[in-house]
From Swiss-Prot:
InterPro entries: F420-dep_G6P_DH, F420-G6PD/mer, F420_G6P_DH-rel, Luciferase-like_dom, Luciferase-like_sf. Keywords: Carbohydrate metabolism, Oxidoreductase. This is F420-dependent glucose-6-phosphate dehydrogenase. It comes from Intrasporangium calvum (strain ATCC 23552 / DSM 43043 / JCM 3097 / NBRC 12989 / NCIMB 10167 / NRRL B-3866 / 7 KIP). It comes from the Bacteria. It is an enzyme of class 1 (oxidoreductase).
Length: 334
């Protein structure tokens, strides 16, 4: 069954506003809400960066049904994975069956400012090794009573998570390339990526790598949630749909451009040098509900079963109402 969620854009809005929109999303029939976890936003001016774990607790208390998770959190530098396991154990105990931990290898923007990672920013090999070790430790803490762990990066001695749900928290692994996607298939409860990067990336690299990982662990596609953040700027006003994407210009920077940038002022400067055409190409920009559905359909046809819609505009209430009335019924029919 296709699931449709809403992305709570923590880099753009404050915590109270995001909670209120989450309540509205649940009322309108969305299945999930995922929040980003940034220490610093993509933009210095008008940016926000609420603490995701506190926010999830508040959102959980204001909602009843919707699944809540991170997309994504880095449990390896500014957080100790044992503390992340404790926090998500508490969230899972408060909201049984509704909490997901989405994780990634991290960005300099969020880790260097607090001294959690050195300069230069660690290369991918170390970041990926930390991620795998963190997942192993967190899962042991969620399932075992006394955990002594001696890893390359993290250690515990007779550690116990006393408040946790009956079932371990699902771990969704975000990947932008086949190596981590393969790991997601082998070890993840879910796989996360973002839209707008060319069909070949998903069809020829990411999803085949997930399938390879599944095969190596004797699992099938039914054993993993295949989630994609859909970058959708939908508005009944075509001009507004195009204008709204400008705030999110940093997403159109290449990985090479963003690598090692730890200052939101510098990130904003780089993003503002991009043309409107460069910014818009990452997004589905439309005022036509049918076109929105058809553009999104390509990801469903590729095998994604969980769509989390990220809308760029500053009026999220307007988007939620228009999208749920105009586009969501068509997606439910896919």
């Amino acid at each position: 069954m296709l699931k449709v969620g809403w992305k709570a854009s923590a880099e753009q809005f404050g915590p109270r506003e995001l909670v209120d929109h989450t309540v509205r999303a649940e009322q309108l029939g969305f299945d999930s809400v995922f929040i980003s976890d940034h220490f610093q936003p993509w933009r210095h001016r008008a940016g926000h960066a609420p603490f995701a774990m506190s926010w999830l607790a508040a959102a959980g208390e204001r909602t009843e049904r919707v699944t809540l998770g991170t997309s994504v959190m880095t449990p390896t530098f500014r957080y100790n994975p044992a503390v992340v396991a404790q926090a998500f154990g508490t969230l899972g105990a408060l909201n049984p069956g509704r909490i997901i931990l989405g994780i990634g290898t991290g960005e300099a923007l969020n880790e260097v400012a607090v001294g959690a990672a050195g300069s230069p920013w660690p290369e991918f090999k170390e970041r990926f090794a930390r991620l795998r070790e963190a997942v192993t430790l967190m899962r042991r803490l969620w399932t075992e009573e006394r955990v002594t762990f001696e890893g390359d990066y993290y250690r515990t001695h007779d550690a116990t998570i006393y408040d946790r749900p009956a079932e371990p928290i699902p771990v969704y692994v975000a990947a932008g390339g086949p190596l981590v996607a393969r790991y997601a298939g082998r070890s993840g409860d879910g796989f996360i990526c973002t839209s707008g990067k060319g069909r070949e990336l998903y069809a020829d690299q990411l999803l085949p790598a997930v399938d390879e990982g599944l095969s190596r662990s004797s699992r099938t596609r039914d054993d993993i949630d295949r989630m994609i953040e859909i970058k959708l700027s939908y508005d009944r006003d075509p001009g507004a749909a195009l204008h709204n994407v400008r705030f999110w210009a940093p997403l159109s920077l290449t990985a090479e451009q963003k690598h090692g940038v730890h200052d939101p002022v510098e990130m904003e400067r780089l993003a503002d040098e991009l043309s409107d055409e460069q910014v818009a190409k990452r997004w589905i920009v439309t005022s036509d509900p049918g076109e929105a559905v058809e553009q999104i359909r390509q990801y469903v046809d590729l095998g994604f079963n969980h769509l989390v819609v990220h809308a760029p505009g500053d009026d999220q209430a307007r988007f939620l109402d228009q999208f749920s009335a105009d586009v969501l019924p068509g997606l439910r029919g896919l």
